[in-house]
Each structure stands twice: as C-alpha cells, then as structure tokens.
Design a protein with these regions (language model features):
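Charged docking surfaces used in two-component/phosphorelay signaling
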Residues: 16-24
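Short amphipathic alpha-helix used as the core "switch/output" element in two-component signaling
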Residues: 40, 62-75
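Alpha4 helix (beta4-alpha4-beta5 surface) of REC/receiver domains from two-component response regulators
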Residues: 63, 86-103, 110, 114
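Receiver (REC) domain active-site loop signature in two-component systems and cognate sites
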Residues: 56
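Active-site beta3 strand of CheY-like receiver
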Residues: 45-51
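Short acidic/polar segment at the start of the alpha1 helix of CheY-like receiver
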Residues: 11-15
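Helix N-cap/capping motif at the beta->alpha junctions
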Residues: 31-40, 61
Length: 122
C-alpha cells in the first residue's frame, strides 16, 4: 500500500496538478480545498504527510498548522508548506514554523517528487 498524502490548497488547478503528479509516482492522494476541510478529513483519515498551502481564504495554512500541531496524534506528522513567497521559504528554512519542508509554487513535477520522496526515504 502506498503512502497517503493530504494536499491542501484553495486553488483547484494546484490540487488537480498535485493529485495527478503524486498518483503517477504511486502515492495515494486526499485533497482538501481549505484548512477547515483538511481538519475535518484528518479526523476521518490517516495520512503520512501533508502538503499545505500557506495563503488560503478563511483559515490560512499557518492557522491550520497551529491546530494540527495541538493534536497529539498529529504532532509528528511531516508537513511541507506550499507557497510562491520567498519570504515564507526563508522563514521555513530559519525554523520559524513547525514544518519539515517547503515546496515553491508553481511546482515542477521533478521538484515535487524530490521534495515528497525525501520524506519517505528510510
């Protein structure tokens, strides 16, 4: 059975692209179009990783991350932020957020594969 990745992004095109790319590499993909939808899915589904858009209407990726990290069963779950922001990339590199990675948008297939695969290398 493949690893399951929850992709959270308010942009339908980004969700579709990530879904197609990750499934092509053998990952199972669950999609959520908002932070609140992601939190609901996490009560029902078990995932191995989350790709989380930072800038979303309503509940931002940062707010979603904060809620996820308060749940003991999700505290160690690998999460990578998705963003086009260079400032956010630097903030992640500086350890300002409880995430394990950053993927710059728009993401190219090879970069997405390298970033995600790195989380599952034993």
């Amino acid at each position: 059975m493949g690893k399951t990745i929850l992709v959270v992004d308010d942009d339908a095109m980004n969700l579709r692209m990530a879904d197609v790319m990750l499934k092509k590499k053998g990952y199972d993909v669950i999609k959520a179009a908002s932070g609140q939808a992601a939190l609901t899915l996490l009560q029902e589904e078990t995932v191995d990783m989350i790709l989380l858009d930072v800038e979303m209407p309503g509940m931002s990726g940062i707010e979603t991350l904060d809620v996820i990290r308060t749940r003991s069963e999700l505290a160690e779950l690998p999460i990578a932020f998705l963003s086009a922001s260079e400032d956010m990339e630097q903030a992640v590199a500086n350890g300002e957020y409880a995430v394990q990675g950053f993927i710059r948008k728009p993401f190219l297939p090879q970069k997405l594969y390298e970033s995600v695969d790195a989380f599952f290398v034993s």
